[in-house]
Regions:
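GST-like domain detector, emphasizing the conserved glutathione-binding G-site
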Residues: 1-111
Length: 111
């Protein structure tokens, strides 16, 4: 079954997930969510994402939301294919640096 990504192609968070999928050479289907029509706030969408945000990953019925969580899930699921995006499990220094940069970028500081 092909992964389904519910999101908006112009959304930064959706694009983050699509970038990871491209780096991992993973097949997926983008299910468009029209943010200008507020589709993410609908009762049907909130079954998938209770906060009404995009993106949402559907992996054979297993739903993951929050773009960074989706990206980590995909990086581990497809660890053996495409670009290596996260450190190995036992690489303590690698994880420390990874988290440091992740937190730094999340706060929006670039210099």
């Amino acid at each position: 079954m092909v992964l389904k990504i519910y999101g908006a192609a112009h959304s930064t968070c959706t694009r983050r997930v699509l970038t990871v999928l491209a780096e991992k050479n993973a097949e997926y289907e983008l299910i468009p969510v029209n943010l200008s029509k507020n589709e993410q706030a609908s009762a049907a969408f909130r079954v998938k994402q209770p906060f009404g945000k995009v993106p949402v990953l559907d992996d054979e019925g297993f739903l993951v939301y929050e773009s960074r969580a989706i990206c980590r899930y995909l990086a581990r699921k497809y660890a053996g294919q495409g670009t290596r995006l996260i450190p190995d499990e036992g690489d303590v220094r690698g994880w420390g640096l990874f988290e440091q940069v992740s937190l730094f970028l999340r706060e929006g500081r670039v210099g």
